[in-house]
Amino acid sequence: MVITVQGADLVRRALNRLFKYGRIDGTKMYYEYYRYSSKMRETRRKKGTKYKTDDEFLERERDAGRLKLYDLQVIREASWEDLLYENVHTAELDIYVRSILKLEDLEPEEEFLRNYAVYDGVHPLKDFVEMRAKNEMQIFGDMPIKAWISVLMEISRETKHKPLGLMVASDFVGRFGSPFEQNFRDLSQINEYGYCYSSPLLFEMCVTESILEFNMWYRMREERIQSLKFGLEVIDPFKLIREFFEICLPHPKKINNTLRSPYSWFVKNWGIGCSRVKVLTSIGGEDRNSKEVFYTGYHETENLYSEIVLKSKFYRESLKQNMTKTEEAITYSQKLGNHGRTMPIFLKMLKAVYTTEFDPTKISHVILASLCLSIQTITGYGRAWVVNKSSDLEAQMKPSSDNYVQRVCDYTKNNFIKAYEEARRGGEEIVMPEDMYTSILRLAKNTSSGFSTSIDVFKRYGPNAKGGRGEKIQITSRIKALVIFTKGHEIFTPKNLALKYNTTEFFQTKGSRDVPIKSTRIVYSINLSILVPQLIVTLPLNEYFARAGGSTLPETQRMGGKIIVGDLEATGSRVMDAADTFRNSSDPLNLTIAIDYSEFDTHLTPYNFRNGMLDGIREAMRRYQHLRYEGYTLDELIEFGYGEGRVMNTLWNGKRRVFKVAFEDYVMLSDEDKVQGTFKPPIGVKPVKNIKICEELEKKADGRDLILVSPTDGSDLALINTHLSGENSTLIANSLHNLAIGTVIREEVKRIFGDDISFKSEQYVGDDTLFYTELRTRSVERFDSIVDTIFEVIKKSGHEASMSKTLIAPFSVEKTQTHAKQGIYIPQDRMMLVSSERRKDIEDVAGYLRSQVQTLTTKISRGFSHELAQIIFMMKSSIIGHRKLKRTIKDGGYRDRKYDDDKEDGFTLIMLRDPLIAFYPVEWNGFGAHPAAMNIIMTEDMFVDSVMRGECRAWMEPLVKLIDQSPPLWNETSADKRMIGTDSTMSFFSRMARPAVRTVLTNSEVGDAVRSLPLGDFSPFNISKTMMHSALLKEKNARSLLTPAYEMEYQKELQGWRPRQKKFLVTSNEMEITTNYMKMFNVGKIPLHGLALKFFPDVNLSKEFFLQKSVLGNRESPRARMSYVDRIDSILRGDVVMRGFITANTIINILEKLGHTHSASDLTTLFEIMNLSSSVAQRLSEYITTERVRFDAMKLSKRGICGDEFSMSLDVCTQTMVDRYIRAPTQFTKTELDAVNLYVAQHIMLDAATGLTPSRYDINVSGDERVRFKQRVARFNTHLPKMRMVKRLIETERLSARLVQNQFV
């Protein structure tokens, strides 16, 4: 119960250890200190500034804790030795040390950098290794590694458990001192590597390993178990984690990459050979992919497939391959680290995987399965050096009579033809010529475009901003939105459309994405002039399949249900989206076949895929052959989008090829051969003319003094003729090709084996294939032959699939990273806590930490400990954003630092927060987590109610003491956006403007009439500027110009802030209510007895979440649609051009100025003038003119209630909940009822989480006439707009206010 208070004390101790001479003691909500660094003074000295005080004196005083500025203590960050003070010796660090290589042993193009020793002197390979280390050993994340170490050391003291990670880190610091230095303001700055270039990765591994161990410690304590179980065998989770950690040490990412599939395979196949199996049974809709699933309880069933599993060659081979993989990883690790360690626990489990029982009712089994899926996060993101390889043209399978290449190609063609026809019947057409330019805006994302554009930005502040427009700064951007706005009119020109990207002058550039565990993914940044023709022809497929559902029965001709792309199965909750996997994994007749293709994209050759795809598209385009796009036919557009030198046989620039050669051989080259061409070599690499010379030099190198060379003439560009993962049609084309292979598999199996196996369902998502089948033979030989046939078809289709990764099993399903086993969910928690894909630039501290609450809630829903999550969140709440201020000084008030001042130069103000800030409402400058359960949001009304609840007293007492004592939080997004602007014209606007806007702009008479309408930024005359400005604010380089200006605004905010000034407001903004509104009414609580406990698939949950699921149950019906603002938003989403620019609030604000009484046709015209498409404008106006909207113009601010992944899977905010738990006056409007819904949802979740009997909540007005009169007045005022509006609107539009006034009399 008192965890929050204990956790806060623990975090305070961690903060006091991290910041020397600070005193964070819980007596106030924030702590201000100074930090001193001499770097600034050194820089200014070089420019001529003279200081009286000596830097060394200031540093000595700081280090001794005697330095103060304006009565504030100067603190310093703790050293590694201060944090890791325990003296330990570990054999694991010995393994790491023995694996460290000299720089001479470098393999320049190895995928993952090995552990190389730091070399202090000059070395020809040093710069290259350091450059790779800086990229590949990056951590990023949101907290410095020292902060993690500090809080983990305190958890270790509290729990008296010492994880291996912390011991290895202590040993490293004891032996070698500082591993690296990380800047606390910008976490991406890692310098001064100590002893080994991979030390940042080692420490990230130590931290993640420790978190995994502590998670096990807390989870086992919550479940009151001493160990995990594999069948009846006792498994020590700490030993299981440690054996994995130590095997990975010699070359972490490579070894983990090898071990990744055996661990997943083990979980999927655990217990599938047992003769009796316990399952969570469920019933569902007719189709196997139905999401309407009801869970009925656990029972034991016979395993019809057990004999096949135990005797079949496939299962023997599969196990053997996974054993071999594991042993290979161990041998590699032993050789590199010169050690004799193995993985006894995992190998023992692997050997007995089929016959050891998995019991879904035993939490010790479920946690072990989950741990095996999560353990791989230890080595962080798989940042790799991806060699720029060309397609292997020789190895590509050509059509012949003994393979299925042509057949698959033909099926792919037919699938495309059928898909277009189906999409057309579903109301989707290709982009028409008149909409061509408008549709280009679909591509206006924040991703790289393959082009770049220069924009003049005017900065209206700072020393050089002299009046008027301000200081002009030129920025270069590659993001698609800005490129389209400034150069969109050039995309579709003959020059750009005819350009072939297959020479060293014209080529395209690859990008990359880092993903946890797996190796870096290549992303092809395809040029916009290629994407636009692709968009025109493939739009109907993307649109249709993103929303079409349907049957997954193989006999069904429609493909809508079988091809699952887009948001069709992404409601935001795994447990709801994957309901079909839980149901099918509990069906004793079902045999799942989930095929895992290796490198699917690189096997999509012209022969088995591209020719068929293009023939299919051409065939489907025949009906549109009369259309002309700027004079071009659709056949020409297909050529521009997919033709030779556009996508087929294109050259791509990626990483330079790097070769290790002898220095003297390089010196002997002629000057001509050493000249640098167009392509710059990486840091620390010498230029050589071409790749041929590099290869010759490499052959001659024989261990003499070595250097690195790279070709610089473009001879190392990669020629690619396969599918590219950045095409507009990537996902849908992959799925249609996959369906073609799946069809051949089904046909061949049917032809040879008749009814021995029946296919019940087929689903395709990109390269994922999932079949639900029923085996009607018990012959082991027949089964093996069926499996052989499947793999043979795949091979003959020109693809590869591995037996060791393909799942063919009863009682087990895996679909898009969701694992289901015997009817329950085995969560795979691969959410990274310590590291992140890229640098986090946190602009809005409160917004970021609110999103962290959601992230941690999702993590808890996947088996993470609630208590540990709260401690981590409190640490993050205290520290994130503590060094945002750069030039602020506190001297009585807040002001800018005096420049070149002896007293102030080198000092920066830092603001630390008390850990309890995590649990205050956002409105009171807190982060809105609730101590009872992370998925409950601490709104103001919830805070007040929690104080009144007896069961919450222990949490709330310390919170009440410091109520509303937190100053405003840093939020750059609230900076005045007008401080930057641009005069770069949006040349593209005239092309993309819709007919109504074009008419207004070209007809002066109409234009004059429109000017009188209150459309503000969205009038036809301003809209291009508004869109340009909005796109500009998405460009990081432009946004960073706002930061210095915001600091001044923030100083004023701090200056004006006073503690304990907050009021409890029933309405948040004008005409907007929140759950606070409920505090106006009387709320009665009637306990409901006799409610049965529910069954649900996600059983690996901490007590706080488990109780909510047991009492409230899994969601069984769709969530009730919230306020009409949501409805307007969903209509606006139908307009691909203006969505994101025009929101429901924009529409409501305009309607408030105009009134709602206009006819639908008037409103349609109005919306068309705002550049909305005619269909969306019509839907919107029809919706707005309906009666119910006129009587309910209130907005509801949900504040994120029930918006996280876990709450989405609970039976809250549904009609069932309303019927069971709510009684409210019939006079309430729709918005008021929505507020009741959210209010009660929070309370029933809190009741469940704290172990109370569920209750019904009766909302009512008071029986006391005087109180009732006050409630009426308050309610009436809420429904009234401000007086300036009232004059316009009171007659008819505000019937809602009149109606409300006459209720509850």
Curated annotation (Swiss-Prot):
Keywords: Nucleotide-binding, Nucleotidyltransferase, RNA-directed RNA polymerase, Transferase, Viral RNA replication. It holds the Pfam family Orbi_VP1. Transmembrane segments: none annotated. The keyword Nucleotide-binding applies. Residues 563-814 form the RdRp catalytic domain. It catalyses: RNA(n) + a ribonucleoside 5'-triphosphate = RNA(n+1) + diphosphate. One of its GO terms (biological process) is viral genome replication. It is an enzyme of class 2 (transferase). One of its GO terms (molecular function) is nucleotide binding. Its EC number is 2.7.7.48. It comes from the Viruses. Belongs to the reoviridae RNA-directed RNA polymerase family. This is RNA-directed RNA polymerase.
